[in-house]
UniProtKB/Swiss-Prot annotation:
PROSITE patterns: UROD_1, UROD_2. The keyword S-adenosyl-L-methionine does not apply. This is Uroporphyrinogen decarboxylase. One of its GO terms (biological process) is protoporphyrinogen IX biosynthetic process. InterPro entries: UROD/MetE-like_sf, Uroporphyrinogen_deCO2ase_HemE, Uroporphyrinogen_deCOase. It holds the Pfam family URO-D. It comes from Geobacillus kaustophilus (strain HTA426). Pathway: Porphyrin-containing compound metabolism; protoporphyrin-IX biosynthesis; coproporphyrinogen-III from 5-aminolevulinate: step 4/4.
Length: 345
């Protein structure tokens, strides 16, 4: 039987009134923590993510250290890709590198299908270990969105302008939509299995979708996203959408069957709501602010919290991941400040 959890985060996801603003941080588990860096001296990322005990330790560490209101599963967005035939290597200082980039419809057709519990069993072993024994806050599962995954698969690795991805999208629409369908199906199966293993909510990361226009999003990407969220909606867990540099796309997300829209720092919460965003909102402190003196951090955070609390359904987060040189003590102090400043008790 799962342990009793603090459900403040989940209630905020559903747009309910909460006694304080819940908080978690993207990349809260990992590179900014000395315990994690010590672990990386002994184990590779591959080894950590493939060993449930190590992965669970990294996942729960920020909950214990910072007092955040949700844990997010420590995995990489590339985790499910090898199961469908994509050769991925995480190279230090570079990121994911794909040995066999997509160049044609034939390349897409060669991709297989994922059987999550068979192909990546360590993901679900980690989830079950956390929710059954270790966590007293909700666990967030996650996956990369089709566009971001496709960008790596087509570019062969990280890109500054995604020109190969967009050229493929424009020049090979049949192959593009076939790839979106393959990745949508993979995402549905992978995330559904996370929820059924015990994840209480899910965030879909579309890290690079800000590279496309709203018109292109509607044409080339949104159909796959609508399919993903409609399928996952049946599982009953809150669904969160987040993209970087995607302020021009939040209206497209607003009519998808999801619960929470994650904002980066480029669009204020108040402005998003003024423009008609009716879902719960998560965000949106610029992570660089965490490297400033405390008085600067406090002033910026108060401004965001004041906007967020104007309506129920608000979760504090950053507008992207924590930088490696942010001090853990800053995150602990920030979490306590948010809880105290927003408490209605």
């Amino acid at each position: 039987m799962a342990r009793q959890i603090n459900d403040t985060f989940l209630r905020a996801c559903r747009g309910e009134q909460t006694s304080y603003v819940p908080v978690w941080y993207m990349r809260q588990a990992g590179r900014s923590q000395p315990e994690y860096r010590a672990l990386k001296e002994k184990y590779s990322l591959f080894e950590i993510t493939h060993q449930p005990e190590l992965c669970a330790y990294v996942t729960r560490l920020p909950v214990e250290q910072y007092g955040v209101d949700a844990a997010i599963l420590y995995k990489d967005i590339m985790t499910p890709l090898p199961a469908i035939g994509v050769n991925v290597e995480i190279q230090g200082g570079i990121g994911p590198v794909i040995a066999n980039p997509i160049r044609s419809l034939q390349d897409v057709e060669r991709l297989g299908e994922i059987d999550p519990e068979h192909d990546v069993p360590y993901v679900f072993e980690t989830i079950r270990l956390l929710v059954n024994e270790q966590l007293d806050v909700p666990l967030i599962g996650f996956a990369g969105a089709p566009f971001t995954l496709a960008s790596y698969m087509i570019e062969g690795g990280p890109s500054k302008n995604y020109h190969k991805t967009k050229a493929f999208m424009y020049a090979e629409p049949k192959a593009w939509f076939a790839l979106m369908d393959k990745l949508a199906e993979m995402t549905i199966r992978y995330v559904r299995a996370q929820i059924r293993a015990g994840a209480s909510a899910v965030q879909i990361f579309d890290s690079w979708v800000g590279a496309v226009s709203a018109d292109d999003y509607r044409t080339f990407i949104k159909p796959a996203m609508a399919r993903i969220f409609a399928a996952l909606r049946e599982e009953g867990a809150p669904l969160i959408m987040f993209g970087v540099g995607a302020s021009h796309l939040v209206h497209e997300w607003n009519d998808l069957p999801l619960d929470v829209i994650g904002l980066d720092w480029r669009l204020s919460i108040r402005e998003a709501r003024r423009q008609g965003i009716a879902k719960a909102i998560q965000g949106n402190l610029d992570p660089a602010v965490l490297l400033a003196p405390w008085d600067v951090i406090e002033e910026r955070v108060k401004r965001i919290l004041d906007e967020g609390m104007e309506r129920p359904g608000y979760i504090f987060n950053l507008g992207h991941g924590i930088f490696p040189d942010v001090q853990p003590a800053t995150l602990k102090r920030l979490t306590a400040f948010i809880h105290e400043y927003t408490s209605t008790n």
